[in-house]
């Protein structure tokens, strides 16, 4: 009976951080696109097309519902559509519900996010919008088997006890006698890439003093690890007519720290304008800075054109500044699976005035082959590909933090890159909170020891100074000599 009373539903609280559009739909994600119209790269919302008169011709979050097919009256759908769903007529005399992005089902009766609470465990259910091909996991427990999500018919489910998977237990919250249990899951819409458009689902179960599960929709705070951004290197071929710069939006200084979703840009200016007058980026790849088999690589630009992944990550098209000249690639900060580091490799071609090979080509080109994972003997962070006389290979590294997670910033351990570890900035080694606390404790201990030692020394000196020499009153003084007679034998 008590188990039955304890069962209830808890509200999933969403932290969408940089997500300006709906948390469930964002056309900037690789698995969510606009059916018609265009995607606004800033808001993540679809801009639906209009008819000849300037009126919208489509509606719904993905602009997938033609207004001409919306049923009128809405009661033609029987049973009626729920939760803001719209009744429409896909074919003659056939009526269906088009759901909003947060619900699904024939009547839009099911929320995509749902949490079940019982007396000893929590179950998180999430039904992504179809074509989802990403990854869902409990924060800080991505590789913990008992915390893993399983998928069945599009539904992702994870069940674990309140003592597992980092569940935070708070007593006497929200009221005296209550117990609150809270945990968070990350929804990555691309299994290899972490972006500001990803979601953080926070579920909270509240068991009150009477043993009933209560709904809770309070949104907590998100702590940000305020560590400095670590831009490491610019590695060029022998001749350096161009450079690779990571900048903030509109060429502003990089934000500190760099968080997922921050607006950044790659700026590649032509430094040698005496010999060359034009440049073109032919390839741009990125990896997570780790050694095989943990290395993840993605190609953003191939043969001068954006790939599908590049289209999702790059804001707008590849642009240029002919006055410099320079290549400009705007993007929102992201990172790849397994590491906060994002290492870029750009292949840039430079041309003289009469050379036409730097002129923009027609896109798209065929998709690039799948990236080849390096063998352990290779050094992916330092490898240089062959380049022709008028090609330059540039490298740059960025560290991106996730403000929605309490993770600690750890650089990936790459055994083959010992030199970079030896040359690490000593100041970065002190940026760990635990190390700083230990240093402070040691300093305080040393100061206390010095104070105690000083006090003991002063006390000892005073005691010696206060000693008084006691003389016998019968003992002669001055220069008199005391003679002791010898015994007669």
Curated annotation (Swiss-Prot):
Residues 363-374 have a biased composition (Pro residues). It is found in: Secreted. The keyword Membrane does not apply. Residues 404-420 have a biased composition (Basic and acidic residues). PROSITE patterns: EGF_1 (PS00022), EGF_3 (PS50026), ZP_2 (PS51034). InterPro entries: Cuticlin, EGF-like_dom, ZP_dom. Component of the acid-insoluble organic matrix of calcified layers of the shell (at protein level). Keywords: Disulfide bond, EGF-like domain, Glycoprotein, Secreted, Signal. Residues 358-389, 404-425 are annotated as: Disordered. GO terms for cellular component: extracellular region. Coiled coil: none annotated. Disulfide bonds join 77-87, 81-97, 99-108. Glycans are attached at residues 229, 414, 479. Residues 1-23 form the signal peptide. Its main location: secreted. Residues 73-109 form the EGF-like domain. This is EGF-like domain-containing protein 2. It comes from Lottia gigantea.
């Amino acid at each position: 009976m008590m188990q039955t009373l304890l069962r209830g539903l808890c509200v999933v609280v969403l932290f969408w951080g940089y997500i300006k559009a709906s948390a469930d739909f964002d056309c900037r994600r690789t698995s969510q696109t606009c059916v018609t119209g265009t995607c606004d790269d800033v808001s993540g919302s679809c801009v639906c097309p209009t008819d000849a008169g300037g009126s919208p011709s489509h509606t719904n979050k993905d602009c997938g519902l033609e207004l001409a097919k919306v049923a009128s009256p809405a009661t033609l759908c029987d049973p009626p559509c729920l939760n803001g769903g719209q009744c429409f007529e896909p074919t003659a005399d056939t009526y269906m519900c088009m759901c909003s992005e947060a619900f699904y089902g024939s009547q839009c009766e099911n929320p995509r996010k749902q949490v079940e609470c019982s007396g000893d465990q929590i179950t998180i259910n999430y039904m992504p919008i179809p074509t989802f091909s990403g990854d869902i996991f409990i924060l800080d427990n991505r590789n913990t088997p008992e915390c893993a999500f399983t998928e069945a018919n599009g539904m992702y489910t994870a069940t674990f006890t309140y003592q597992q998977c980092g569940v935070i237990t708070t007593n006497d919250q929200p009221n005296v006698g209550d117990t609150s249990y809270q945990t968070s899951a990350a929804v990555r819409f691309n299994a290899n890439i972490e972006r500001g458009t990803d979601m953080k689902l926070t579920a909270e179960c509240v068991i009150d003093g009477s043993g009933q599960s209560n709904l809770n929709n309070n949104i907590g705070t998100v702590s940000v690890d305020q560590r400095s951004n670590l831009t490491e290197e610019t590695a060029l071929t022998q001749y350096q007519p161009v450079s690779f710069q990571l900048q903030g939006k509109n060429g502003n200084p990089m934000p500190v720290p760099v968080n997922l979703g921050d607006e950044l840009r790659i700026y590649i200016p032509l430094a040698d304008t005496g010999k060359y007058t034009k440049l073109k980026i032919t390839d741009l790849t990125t990896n997570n800075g780790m050694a095989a088999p943990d290395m993840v690589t993605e190609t953003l630009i191939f043969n001068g054109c954006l790939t599908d992944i590049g289209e999702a990550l790059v804001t707008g098209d590849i642009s240029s500044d002919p006055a410099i000249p320079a290549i400009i690639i705007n993007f929102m900060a992201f990172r790849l699976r397994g590491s906060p580091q994002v290492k870029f490799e750009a292949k840039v071609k430079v041309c003289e005035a009469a050379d036409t090979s730097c002129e923009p080509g027609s896109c798209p080109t065929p998709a690039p082959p799948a990236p080849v994972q390096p063998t352990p003997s290779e050094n992916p962070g330092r490898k240089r590909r062959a380049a022709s006389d008028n090609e330059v290979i540039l490298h740059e590294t960025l560290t991106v933090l996730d403000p929605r997670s309490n993770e600690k910033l750890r650089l990936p351990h790459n055994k083959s890159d010992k030199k970079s570890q030896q040359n690490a900035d000593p100041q970065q080694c002190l940026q760990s909170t635990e190390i700083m606390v230990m240093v402070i404790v040691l300093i305080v201990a040393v100061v206390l020891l010095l104070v105690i030692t000083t006090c003991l020394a002063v006390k000892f000196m005073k005691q010696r100074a206060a000693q008084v020499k006691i003389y016998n009153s019968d003992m002669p003084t001055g220069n008199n000599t005391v003679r002791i007679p010898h015994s007669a034998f």
